[in-house]
């Protein structure tokens, strides 16, 4: 089966090592991979002989996101429900990971974007390295940070989550550790030794795993130009109520001090889909007050509207401009933030009405919900 070659499984004593294996596609998650991961995680949770699950990627990426082009192709052909099924399974997997009763260690030694964050950040342990590149670039594609991102981004220090989710800014391993998205930082040259020691774990008690990881972890310095050094500016600007106010605040910062970071941030926001920016901001803000299950259920409503194309076709246009034609010149609709009214935003958060057999995402209550460990290291 293709799914078995795309997710490799190693059994080492009481540890299971899963490797995402589509290196040419930067381990982008297709439907078969998501189904396979969901099957394996559920089986391991029921198997008393399994104490720890390690997840990593083959090649230079952990996982660069979901396999979006086939989903968009189905949208164009009017088969939006196939995309809805893809996201239903993906969000269910995210929920299982967020509520997993056994420790999961994700080794983020490379590119981590979009769906790659969904299969790692919800787990208890996230290992960054000097090769880590993290981003949530959905607003530049006409989508929104999903896979439970409204839950984990909203729990970052201050308004750093809004900054990361709205701009698609890239973070390195040191920044990931500093803001709490990573729990540990381990040099890539030490990963083989770390994995060997983790495979000696004979208990599902997270403290045993934590002790091993703590022995390997380092605390790298942030680069001088790191966005994390600008938390005061980020909080001042991204705490504003609306997207228009956020951009105005950033523009005021540039009048006081000409700064490449502010200009780059404004440019990224102005190139993104106005509808995506507005629904993303609201989603992250609502996530501050919601549990992970509630966030995923809400995001499923939102993504079904995107799949159906009844409220916006920006995902189709963004995919064309960024992934297919690569002219990087999407024609968003509406083109201006001020034309995306609050009443239009509201519709993304409502049920998909007038559709037979459509249902909200139903996530069964689980007793294992562990608080997401977002602990800033600075």
Swiss-Prot record:
One MF annotation (Gene Ontology) recorded for this entry: 3-hydroxyisobutyryl-CoA hydrolase activity
Catalytic reactions of this protein: 3-hydroxy-2-methylpropanoyl-CoA + H2O = 3-hydroxy-2-methylpropanoate + CoA + H(+)
SUPFAM superfamilies referenced in this protein's UniProt entry, alphabetically: ClpP/crotonase (SSF52096)
EC number: 3.1.2.4
Pathway as given in its UniProt record: Amino-acid degradation; L-valine degradation
Keyword tags: Branched-chain amino acid catabolism, Hydrolase, Peroxisome
Protein residues bound to substrate: 138, 146
Gene Ontology terms: cellular component: peroxisome
A Pfam cross-reference name: ECH_2
Role: Involved in valine catabolism.
Sequence similarity: Belongs to the enoyl-CoA hydratase/isomerase family.
Protein name per its UniProtKB record: Probable 3-hydroxyisobutyryl-CoA hydrolase 3
Originating species: Arabidopsis thaliana (Mouse-ear cress)
Lineage: Eukaryota, Viridiplantae, Streptophyta, Embryophyta, Tracheophyta
